[in-house]
Amino acid sequence: MEKVNLTEKFSQFSEHYSPKIAGELNGQMVKLVKFKGPFVWHHHDNEDELFYVVRGSFEMEFRDKTVTINEGEFIIVPRGVEHRPNAKEEVHVVLFEPGTTLNTGNVKNEMTIDNLGRV
């Protein structure tokens, strides 16, 4: 059992929308990701996602509304719900989701990351 220092882990990478695995528990992955700018519209057929903001804030856009998630807050996006993260400034986010979750969900494009790195 070892503790994880999020500040130190986030300092190990600079890419946006490229999740890194920081831990695993019960089939779930703890992923660290930096957002800046809009991501691709997508949904996940089989997985819910939890987005916890460590630093900064971002807007989670849905087709019918936009929700601002600030530092210290989280949002759970249920499976099947189309969404798109969008950050005006860089934001640091912790994701909790099944290990099989593809970052772009039902969409395959240049933002899709098939093999996640570890920090």
Predicted region positions:
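Short, surface-exposed charged micro-motifs
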Residues: I21, L50, E59, T66, ...
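Short, charged/polar surface micro-motifs in flexible loops or helix N-caps
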Residues: G27-M29, K36-P38, S57-E59, T66, ...
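Short, conserved beta-strand element in jelly-roll/cupin
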Residues: K34-F35, H44-E61
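Short acidic-glycine-tyrosine-enriched beta hairpin
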Residues: R63-R79
